[in-house]
Each structure stands twice: as C-alpha cells, then as structure tokens.
C-alpha cells in the first residue's frame, strides 16, 4: 500500500468546517508523511477539469509546500514533472504492517457529499490537469484518498516520492516517521470528487503537473497568530503561494485556512514593535501575526506587499524592491486628539485603535481605508511623476503637499495665521520643508521647496537616479557639477543599527525618514553599509551619522577603508550601544535620552567640528601547530639528508638535460614534472631533518648551497618554458590567422591547446617552488651565528648570480641572466619584516601562513587577559540568549556579574608568564598582572579613564586621539577595574609608544578583544601599528551655546513691536531729502542681502539668517518697486516708485533694522568661521549703521531706533519679586541639603560615586536658555 493511505491514521479531515484535529502523537521531525486522504472527486467537476474520463486520478498535493520544501528563496522551488509517477520508492521501507480497513471500495460510483468548509480556504482550481497523469489503476484506493494530493514539488526526490500520491496495490505499509512539512488547503469545489468507477488501462498522454510549477511558494514558516482566545497567541504554520496566504495548526494538516492577498495591506503593531507583530488587513478580515524576529517580519511584509502587484515569482529585497515604490509603510498608532483620515476624510477619534500612520509621510488612515490609499508616499527618484521631473541643469525641487492633521502651533507661511482644524481635513503641509499653508494661500507660496533649515543635509529626489533599474540608487551625473549649496551642500548619510538602544534604532529609522530623503537612511542589519557608501561615493564631501554602538562604528569605518573615502567623509556617532566609549570622547554623550527628539541630532551634526582619529592595525602571526609527519615518514639525520639531497640534485640535473634536448612537447612536459617532483622532495627532506640541521653550521651551509643550485635549475626551466611558449604561440597564431583570413575574414581569436596549458601550469608550479626555496635560504641564514653568516654571505645569491658568470658575457642579456636579475631584484625588494617572520620549522605551510595578517582595525582600545575574558563571556551569552541582553541597564549588570565571577576565579593571575610585551622595540618587564590594555582614546569599558588623567606629566604626554601614540596600561584585577570608575588611578601605567608587540607563549589561546569584540587568540605574535586616520565629527558645545544665544536674541528682535504713526502723519509723503536717504539705505541693504546670499552657499550656518533676508528683500521689492516678490534680487528689473509715504518708510526701516540686528548678533556670537568673510560682512553692516544714525535724527523716525522704556514702578515691582522669593527658596533648599550627623559617610560615598557620572548626564542635556542678564 502507498504511503498516502498511511497518513489517514495520523490525521483526519475536519468535519463541518471545524479546525482539523491534531495527530494523537506529537509531530516528529523531518521527513514528514503525506497528508490524510480525502473523498474521491465528483463526476461533474471531473468533466469540467478534463474532457476525457479519467479512470484513476493521481492524488494531488494541496497548494502548500512539499515535505522537502523549506523557507528558502522562492527561486529554489521550481520542479520538473514526474514522467514515471508509479516509480517504486526506495527510501521508505515498510517492514511492519500498519493497514487500516477502508469502509468502502475505491471504485464506488456514488459521490460522497462534501462538507461545508470555509470559503476563504479554497485554493484556485488551476492545477486540475494533474488528474490525468496516472498510468495505472489502483483498486485498493479508499474513499478518503484526496484528489488534491499532487507529486512533490522539489526536484531531487521527485522519482522517489511520486508513488506517495499515486496509490498502488500494497497489502501492508508502515507510516512515515515524520509529518509532512506543509500541505495545501483543500478546495471546497473538489472535496466531493471521487475516482472514476471504470479504470482505464492506458495512461493519459498529458504531462503531469504539480502545484509548485504553477504557483511557487514564496515564503513559509511558523508564526504566532492572535486568536482572541484565553491564550491569545497560538503557533500556526503559514505560507504564501500565488496571491494567497494559507495557515493551519501544523504543516502536516491537509486543510488550511486561506486569506486572499490580492487586496490587502500590512501595518506593524506599534512604533518600536518589540514583539515583531503585524496586522494583515483585507476587506473580509484582519489577522494579527507575530514573527520570530524583525528580519523575518520584514520579509513577510515585503512579500505580502509585493504580490499585490500580481503573481510575482521572484521577490526582490525590500531595500531595492521597485514594486514598493510609493507604497505607504503603516504602523498602528493613536493620538490624544482627534485626527482625520487622509483617504475617506472622516474623523478618527482620540485614542482609537483603528488608526494607522505611515512611518515616512505621516499620513493617517483607518485600517480598512488603507486598502484604498494611493501610492503617494514621500518621493524617491522612482516615484516622482513625469510632470515633476526637471531639466538636468536645474536643481529646483517642488513641494510635496499632504492635507490636514497639522501640529497644534502651525502657522501659514504666507499669511502667518493659524493652520489646521479639529473639525475637518484642511490646509496643507510640505513633507520636505515642513511648511504649512492654507489652501487659498498655496498659490501665492513659492513653487520651489527650499528644505528649510536642514537643506544642507538633504538629497533632493531629483538628484538621484536608478540607471540599472534594480533599485540601486546613485547620484545622477548631471548633478555632480552643479551648485549644490542651495539644496545639498554636504549631504548626510545615516546608518542605524535597528537592534541597538533597546530597539530605539527603529524610532530613529522612522524619524529620519520623515526629516530627510528616505533613500539616504539605511539599516545596518539589511545588507550593511555598502549600499549607502556606493550611492554617496561620488560626492566631493559628505557626512555620515552612525546610530549604534562602537561595533557599528567599526563596521562603517572598515567599509570606508575599502571604498577609500576617508578624505571625503566625516563621521558622527549617536550612542545607542552599551559602552559608547568613542561617542563619549567625541562629545556625543554616554547614551541618547529617549525623551529628546531626533531632530536635535541634525542640528548638532550640522554644528559639529572636525577632529582626526588615529586608527591602528591589529596584525596577527599565529604560531602554526606542529603537524606530525605523515604515515611512513620519519625524522632524518644529517648524513641521510646529505645523501638524499645529492640524489635530488642529480635527478634535477638529469631531468633538466632531458628538457633541453627534448624534441617533442610531451617529452618536455614529462621531464618538467619529474624535475618539480625532485624539488618538492628536496624541500620535504629539509623539513624532516631541520631539527638536526639547525644545530650544525656546516649542515646549514650545505642546505644553502644545495638550495641555491635547485633555485638555479628552476630558473633555467622557467626560461625554457617561456621561450617554448612564445615560439609556439607565435607560429600557431600566424597559421591560424592565415587560415581564418582565407576562410570567411572573421576576426581572429587565438586558442590555447592542451599542451600549452600544461606548460603554463608547470611554469606556475616552478615559480611557486622558487619562492619556497627563496624562503628556505633566507630563513636558514638566520640560524647561522654571526661569524658563519659573514663567511657565507658572499657565497649566497651574490656568488650565484654574478661571480660565476663569465666576464665576457656580462653585457649579454640571455634569458637565464634576465631571470636571475629579476629574481635578485625580487629578493632585495623583500622587507626585513617578512624575513624576520619566516620559520623553517613550518615550511609545510604556505608562506602567507607565517606572515603577519591584519586581523582587524582598532579605533578605541585593545585588551588581552582579564577584560577580554569578561567581554568574551558576555558576547557568548548574548549570542545564546539575545532576549536577555536587549537593554543597556541589563548589559551593565551582566558585565558586573561576570567581573565579580572573575574576582573569585582569577583565570589569568599569572599572565606575565605567558605574555611578553615590546613597546617601540623595547622589551618591557611586566609585573604580576591579569591583563594588558592598549588605549587609543581616553574612555575605556563604558567611561573609565583608565590612563588616569588627561594632563601631561614629566614622564608622559597628555593622551589624545590624534597624537599617533598608544597608552599601555596594566590590569591587576577586577577590584582595580571597579575602583577606576570612582577615582583616577595612575600606578598601573606601563608605557606610551607608537607601536606595540605582544608575544603569546604556550599551546593554549588567550582571550583578546578589540573595541569590545573578543575572541580566543592562539599563541603567536600580535603587532599593533598605525594604519590611517579618520575624520570624526565632535560635538561643539561652544558653538551650540552661541547658536542658542543668537536664537534667543533673534526671538527678542522678532518680538519687538513695530512703532505706529498717527493716521495723519502716516499718509504724508517723504521729502526729497528723506526719500534720497531711504534710497541710499535700500542700496546698502541690497548689498548686505547679496553678501549674505553668497555666504549661505559657502557656510551652512548662515542659513539661519535667510528668514530675515527674505523678509527684507520682499518688503524692498513691494514698496520700492511695487511688485509682489518671491525673488530676493528682483529689484533690478523693475521700475522704482518715485515717492513713499511715511508709513511705508517706517515698514522698510523696521524690517531692515531687524536684518541688521540679526546679522550683528550673528557676528557677535562668532558663528561665522571665516575671518575674511566676517570682515567683508562687518563693513556692510557699518555702512548701514551710519545710515541708521542719520535716519534717527528725523523726529517721526526716532521711535524705531529708540524704543520706549517701561515705567520705573513696574521695573521695581518686578525686581522685588525676582529678588524676594528666590532667597527664601534658596535658604530652604540649603537647610534641606544640610547633612545630618549620621549621614555624613553615606553622603560622601554617594557623592564620590555619582561624580563619575555627572559629566555624562550633563552631556546629554542641553544648556540652559540664556537669561536676560547674560544678554
């Protein structure tokens, strides 16, 4: 009996729409058994599926995966049709009978009525032709045999598993030891089908087809499903096939529920989404699922969103998926106030769970309304419509408007009235510059988007292109040479580790996509930094922001090395990891405060200054393991080696003579192989006898001379092979070219025959043997004493290459002589470091294995011993249980526990016996210690200044990250590391040097860590030397304070009320003299505006003055030239007005006085970092100041320059209030803070502990707003 009938014992089909009953035994692992049988097909549907009566249908697999199907890529799921469906299975023995009596014969003609299944679980009936693929009848078929069971879709076991679905006569069987991976749902239209009563002896001529050839399984796997029951979350098995989602209790079930995904949308469950859950929304139902991890969840979402475009057989990655262009990225959210749906325009109540929001464009929608949402998310280069594409010589960017749902304090950029409404969806907001305007004012607003304050960091979507059409965006070449200052002077590339910071990186991803171009924000867990660096590498300069820990920073810097972009980019760090030592040193703080907006990061990065960070290569040369001699090989003494070496030399000479006298290519090839074999045997004998050779100087000299002779024979061989190859190729090329020219005049392409290929391979092998002999000679010389080395130096390569040559042939350039000269030059070009690193004990290794290799690059610190052991244990535990290490506080607690454990174990209490230290070539005598730390920065292990202080002493210089020096520190135990967090220790300093060499002795490895990444280092040498320097962005707090001070002054200037004239005075016209003065002031203002516009293209911080510049330019154009200006410098092309009223003069003067005050405050705070530009700007301001003094002499103009002061009574009352209450409060606070007698020791210890952490907390906080007294 076939295995398809055996599945009926483990699983039975559900009745009347109930859930399928689980197997009485827990499902064992793979390979799974086939699904349970189902009723035979009914005659009516059979006639629809096939025009001819089919006597015996092959059971068809449900539209799910086969037992061998996995959740791998969908491209691996194609299968070939099975030409022999009745092939006998070989891998499924049936030694034990396990039959089940069938209640009815398989040939019963009466159809059995089908039960009432769920309509959504019905798959598409396309694979009906599979019913014609059975060549022989099966009278033992029971009524439960399902016609939906089709042959396996995987290609390898097709011939083996096909009989499972084509029943044969078998009296007994044994069930398969594992359930099927997945079976497809049972179609309700096919559930009543039964087999034909009259079997046909002849097979059908049609080729059998499987479900997997029609619809591929795009993804499958287990997920948790929210069942709205007591347990809520239950494990189910899911798969996506075609445009449908199938799920069941277990992959072995034959009956699956079905969800149609042709009209569906997906929304994540929350903003941070720690549970990796998402909701699939269709017009009929909503289902909430939870994936094992975020990567798996994003793959499901990517597939579900992609197949809405149709049945797609290859799903691209989400980052480069052209099918997702313009689609919204929804997640569930709620608001404390009423919102409005951007699709149906209806209101969304406050705290409603039915609201979802797009993480990029912040569009709101009901869940069901999202099905009808248009694909108008924030633009990238692929989603811009044709009418928005601009010519290549323009960098202008249009606005992208979103209607309604304004922030509370929104104001119209045109009329400065409030925008938005709680009652309806009205007014518009630009996604790029965040400007809000009324619908009526939008036509009067500028058509060009200026990106507001962050325009220097944003890449316009018009500047990107997709030349290959694969979603890999690059900066268009048409925009490289344009003036990017108005839109993108120094763009910002953002890399975020979404797992860092207790999944705070997810919030950063969404926020930065809202503030910037979504195409310039990358998740490091999705392909790493390669895609972002490839897109930005054509910019002359750009900035990089890494949101993560020290490991993420090292990852990005290593890719910058590979791309060679250190001269172009500057890197800033936002601390989201555990230690964040580099971020502390660069001034970005110990951690990021979750209560702060990520928008502050953009301001700080744009105001940061550049500092150089030294980077160091960690070079490793491991001591190769002593490999025992092969079976049959024994160690050789010196006499035996001498005899064997002479035989090898004679054999090599004999074979070389055969090569020189060979008449046929085959003879040359055979002799060359024997010559190479003789050289290999010679090298192996040296390895065997080296233990005896290195104790005898005479034997060492003999090895050098014999190796020299072998090297000379190989040089002759290589020259002969080169001459033969050149002559043969020239002759053959000429012959073939002549033949081809006579034939059809096609272009000639030379071909390499078998003999030429063999000669080429032998020449390559001979060159490799030459390198080995070269290494042997130089290493053997190192074993000689000084006297013998001086004696043999003349007899080495110098005697071989020059002294033995005939003086008459010195000027000749024979091939042999050329080869020798080339070899000598290559030997002389070897570095002394390579010669010192060779070891003849390990010649059976390749030369590369006994040289230094760069293991990694150090940015922060290097540790060996105790601290590396703690870091290694922590990393091992985190890899095993990632859920327990998802927060910064937990990680610090684990570090403390592991350090306490080492306090008791003292694993490396005698490390100085196994480790030797050299600093700048000088051997350092080590005390009794447990670890060594090499510092590049002044922060170690989460904020410890392990060097002790940042000041210089008589013995050591002050440490710095750009001084080209390393600080070496000793670790005596866990207590010392703990005390270093409280007080500065100095007694454990070892050295300050430019290069460090550490030797590890013994046979066991020692833990080593670089920047928190630890591993077990085998015995050998570790060298730390300078590699290169990186440009890092450090937080400039002085500049930030100056900018805040300017912003405070700017706010006061803008808040100053404009003086008002009497109605009669306001209507009077200016005199000729007054009008001339106003015209002169306007010209000076135009000069200042022009200078500020030019400086804004060079200095990005000047952009804060553009608001005052635009306002002054507009009022000059409106009043002096009578035009509605959107252009700052449009006055030159207009006809000036002949006279002005006093009211207009007051408006112009007040606006220009505001621009003057803003610019003066900008220079007073030293915000312009260029002395030459500051001098030019100051001269323009001085000219305007002189004109203001002349205008202040006019009586009706004086209130503008001398504002009214407040009355003395108000000031005195205000002063008394300011002085009286703070004194009482201060006295009370001092009394409360006065320590009691029993708390003095506790207070001292607490203050001592918290003193180390106050600086980090202060770094994360913004400085206080400057008071009026400071101004």
Swiss-Prot record:
Zn finger (Phorbol-ester/DAG-type) location: 327-377, 398-449
One annotated GO biological process: platelet activation
Annotated spans, 33 X 4 AA approximate tandem repeats of E-P-A-P: 48-179
Tissue expression as described in the entry: Expressed in testis, and to a lesser extent in placenta.
A Pfam family recorded for this sequence: PH
Domain of life where this protein originates: Eukaryota
Catalysed reactions listed for this entry: a 1,2-diacyl-sn-glycerol + ATP = a 1,2-diacyl-sn-glycero-3-phosphate + ADP + H(+); 1,2-di-(9Z-octadecenoyl)-sn-glycerol + ATP = 1,2-di-(9Z-octadecenoyl)-sn-glycero-3-phosphate + ADP + H(+)
The keyword Transferase belongs to this UniProt entry's keyword annotation: yes
Protein name per the record: Diacylglycerol kinase kappa
Organism: Homo sapiens (Human)
